[in-house]
């Protein structure tokens, strides 16, 4: 298990805060070399992330990616507006300027925030879907400049095509390859105008993101029941993009809510340190959430969002910060029992590493379970066409359909998941924490954990490309194995690792995309000791697999 830093959950010493001037200076002065792996564009479903201080998120990265997206749009025939938003990380605004310079030079119609404010990821998804509704041509797409809950020195840039959700690999690989080619060619072929000219360009337009999103919220959450109940709500935007949205929501719907802090500071000095002593706006971490958890008795229900507001953290009174898996299970149970206009065949979307409590809830409410690999992109089609009522990940990211049963967003929306916690509390007269406690009495108590174990790049490749026969296990912690999967049962897509299940427990193992470790997710419905046995057997089986491969290579 990782060792918890002595600084975890405590205010960060001013001496340890990031130097914003140095960060911004490095953005412009450091020139990435695409021959160095760590300095290349690596554009996954969460986009490209890095830091200017490590030459992994700099001006040339953003100019190249923006040109690659302009090229992709042209090739794909995407001619509608590109909705663009930023979060509150220090590198987000300079990256926006770089992107606008390229998009304007390419004649791309771009919609920027009317007030030069911040725009959450779900708001961009909502804007794309709203614009594209009932259109078959001149479709819109979008860009969100955010590294999500990553530390203050990081930047991020992600692309959402016309379906409004995260771009899949068929798009991201094209963008990544083209961007790296531009950098390798010393930026030859990258079109650019000055920032002043970009702002004055007829294709750069101001857009009110706040009003349409806020006005539409009653179509997805029952704002009337929240207001009429008078339930007291605490909200912490964690200094992120949702900071511009909560007051308009409170004013529009008259709910009894308090924003505990509206402070925005690119050093995020108001945060308490995460488990490793780093600042991270992770609303599912009890260490990063110490401020709001400390206020748990002041409100009936409280919640926070990460920096781009695609994730949620629910503080449920005496129960404190809810484990994301627990809240997903409660949200699913509540929604499918209280959305009478949803299609009776709409399913429950979960990832292979999310709690099996969700499986038990889906069975209890008589809904189809759709289990997919890790990544919200796998829920996009289901949410878009209404075959999924809900899609959620154990990392506290989820979205669900409008009350009428049609698509709301195809990206994670931490704002509606927070408001849903208030709706549950208002309608049922009990918090999601109490609802989960009741659920365990009926369906059992799961013991769930994720641990990291070391793995070099060769070992990570072995794990990613496994076949079920290679694992060779017949029992898991004293129970016969029911399934060994390397492809997700919900859609047949590769897990990028494996999942082994028995009656009362399971584990999944998959390599990290960024570090030399692999992750073991495990769960027991018996006890903490049984969970430990599952984790030990999982690690032993994978170590044996690595040893066998090393032996084979040596031979």
From Swiss-Prot:
Which amino acids does the record list as binding Mg(2+)?
148, 306, 308, 310
Question: EC class of this enzyme?
Answer: isomerase
Q: What is its EC number?
A: 5.4.2.2
Active site: residue positions = 148 (phosphoserine intermediate)
Looking up SUPFAM superfamilies in the UniProt record yields: Phosphoglucomutase, C-terminal domain, Phosphoglucomutase, first 3 domains
Q: Name one GO biological process term.
A: glucose metabolic process
Q: Which NCBIfam families match?
A: pgm (TIGR01132)
What does the function comment of this entry state?
This enzyme participates in both the breakdown and synthesis of glucose.
Q: Which PANTHER family match?
A: PHOSPHOGLUCOMUTASE 2B-RELATED (PTHR45745:SF1), PHOSPHOMANNOMUTASE 45A (PTHR45745)
Q: What is this protein called?
A: Phosphoglucomutase
Q: Which organism is it from?
A: Komagataeibacter xylinus (Gluconacetobacter xylinus)
Classification lineage: Bacteria, Pseudomonadati, Pseudomonadota, Alphaproteobacteria, Acetobacterales
Q: Which gene encodes it?
A: celB
């Amino acid at each position: 298990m990782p060792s918890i830093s002595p600084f975890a959950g405590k205010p960060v010493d001013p001496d340890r805060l990031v130097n914003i001037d140095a960060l911004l200076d490095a953005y412009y002065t450091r020139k990435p070399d695409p021959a160095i792996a760590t300095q290349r564009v690596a554009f996954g479903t969460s986009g490209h992330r890095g830091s200017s201080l490590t030459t992994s998120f700099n001006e040339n990265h953003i100019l190249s990616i923006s040109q690659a997206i302009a090229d992709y749009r042209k090739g794909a025939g995407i001619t509608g507006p590109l909705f663009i938003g930023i979060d509150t990380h220090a590198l987000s605004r300079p990256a926006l300027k770089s992107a606008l310079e390229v998009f304007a030079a390419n004649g791309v119609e771009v919609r920027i925030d009317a007030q030069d404010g911040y725009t959450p990821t779900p708001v961009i998804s909502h804007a794309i879907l709203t614009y594209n509704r009932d259109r078959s041509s001149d479709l819109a797409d979008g860009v969100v400049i955010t590294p999500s809950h990553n530390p203050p020195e990081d930047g991020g840039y992600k692309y959402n095509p016309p379906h409004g959700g995260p771009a899949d690999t068929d798009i991201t690989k094209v963008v990544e390859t083209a961007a790296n080619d531009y950098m390798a060619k010393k930026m030859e072929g990258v079109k650019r105008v000055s920032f002043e000219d970009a702002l004055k360009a007829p294709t750069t337009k101001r857009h009110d993101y706040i009003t349409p999103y806020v006005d539409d919220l009653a179509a997805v959450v029952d704002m009337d029941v929240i207001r009429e109940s008078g339930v007291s709500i605490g909200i912490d935007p964690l200094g992120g993009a949702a900071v511009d949205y909560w007051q308009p929501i409170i004013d529009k719907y008259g709910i009894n809510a308090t924003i505990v802090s509206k402070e925005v500071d690119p050093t995020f000095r108001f945060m308490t340190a995460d488990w490793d002593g780093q600042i991270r706006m992770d609303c599912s971490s009890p260490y990063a959430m110490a401020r709001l958890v400390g206020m748990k008795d002041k409100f009936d229900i409280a919640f926070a969002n990460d920096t781009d507001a695609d994730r949620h953290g629910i503080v449920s009174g005496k129960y404190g910060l809810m484990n994301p898996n627990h809240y997903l299970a409660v949200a699913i149970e509540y929604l499918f029992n209280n959305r009478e206009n949803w299609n009776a065949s709409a399913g429950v979307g979960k990832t292979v590493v999310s709690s099996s409590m969700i499986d038990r809830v889906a069975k209890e409410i008589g809904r189809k379970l759709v289990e997919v690999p890790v990544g919200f992109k796998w829920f996009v089609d289901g949410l878009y066409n209404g075959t999924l009522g809900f899609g959620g990940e154990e990392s506290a990211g989820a979205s669900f359909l409008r009350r009428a049963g049609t698509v709301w967003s195809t990206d994670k929306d931490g704002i509606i998941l927070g408001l849903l916690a208030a709706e549950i509390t208002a309608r049922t007269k009990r918090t999601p924490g109490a609802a989960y406690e009741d659920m365990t009495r009926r369906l059992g108590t799961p013991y769930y954990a994720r641990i990291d174990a070391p793995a070099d790049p060769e070992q990570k490749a072995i794990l990613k490309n496994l076949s079920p026969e290679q694992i060779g296990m017949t029992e898991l912690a004293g129970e016969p194995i029911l399934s060994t999967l390397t492809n997700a049962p919900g859609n047949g897509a590769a897990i990028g690792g494996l999942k082994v299940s028995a009656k009362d427990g399971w584990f999944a193992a998959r390599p990290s995309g960024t570090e030399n470790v692999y992750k073991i997710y495990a769960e027991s419905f018996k006890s903490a000791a049984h969970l430990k046995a599952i984790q030990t057997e999982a690690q032993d089986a994978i170590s044996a697999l690595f040893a066998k491969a090393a032996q084979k290579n040596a031979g």
